[in-house]
Amino acid sequence: DSDSGETAVVSDYVAQQTQQTLETLAAVDARFKALGGELTDEQIATADRYAQQMMDQYGDTYTANGIGLETIKAYERLQVEHTALLDMVYGPDGETPVEDDELTSHLDDSMYEICYISIPLYNTSTYAFANDDQKTKMLRLAQTAADSVNAAGGETVSDQVSALHEAAQNALPDIYAVLDGETSDDSASVQTELLTESDVASTFTQDGAADALRSLSYGEAAAVQINGYTLLLLVRVDPLSVSSLDDLREQVLSDMKGSELDDALASSGAELAHSLNSSAMNKLPAKKIVNSSANS
């Protein structure tokens, strides 16, 4: 492990992870049934259809590793059960429901709804990347556009998005011109996304970018360079002005309680009696696992 410095024999690691996964999946099924869960015909059909798609796409790899369609179907059905457990445990009628005010607080403090326009820090025709001076100029022009959005003072999300789109249309030709580029018909298209802290950490990797997003109030626009090749002209909006809490409940619960549920399932699975043959798993060297992508 590059962070902890710990080392492990690969075959031991594979055996351990295989057993933990099987134990956790068994715990998912046990918990689902204990809470009275039963998959609907539609859920089963959806899981089976996805399993067939996976088999169609990766069948050679699965077959080489001794995995058949029925195993994939069982796995996909367990994934449906796992998703359902989140609501069965933490939903409004769940075992330990999370109150609406807790969900709203998590939305406010740890999730970020943004309307944004992505600006490449390279010429899209020649793929010549901007140097530091060019990036600085592009960022300055984009921030001027963001300032105009803030000056417009839109009170609704619709107003804010309209102001963002208009500002982008006005600014993008000059921004693209820094790299001798030209805009396209969809350059000023506004996209919307609800980000978790994990999303922010993995996407806003440029120094200071994540904090720049976190510092924004609802309705506030900014230009943020998120990595070495992308600049966002964005406005942070109130998620509950875009969607209802019920519409967002599953996504918020997943971010808020997903890890807690997974930890509980892993712990429960480790305590379940089973007849898994750990010595048999240890006989499968990691080098015998077929990885088609490694051979392509």
Locate the predicted segments by residue.
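Extended amphipathic secondary-structure runs
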Residues: 19-42, 183-184, 197-208, 213, ...
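Peptidyl-prolyl cis-trans isomerase
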Residues: 144-206
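PPIase-associated folding chaperone regions across multiple families
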Residues: 63-137, 199-296
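Solvent-exposed loop/turn and edge beta-strand elements of beta-rich ligand-binding domains
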Residues: 43-46, 132, 138-151, 156, ...
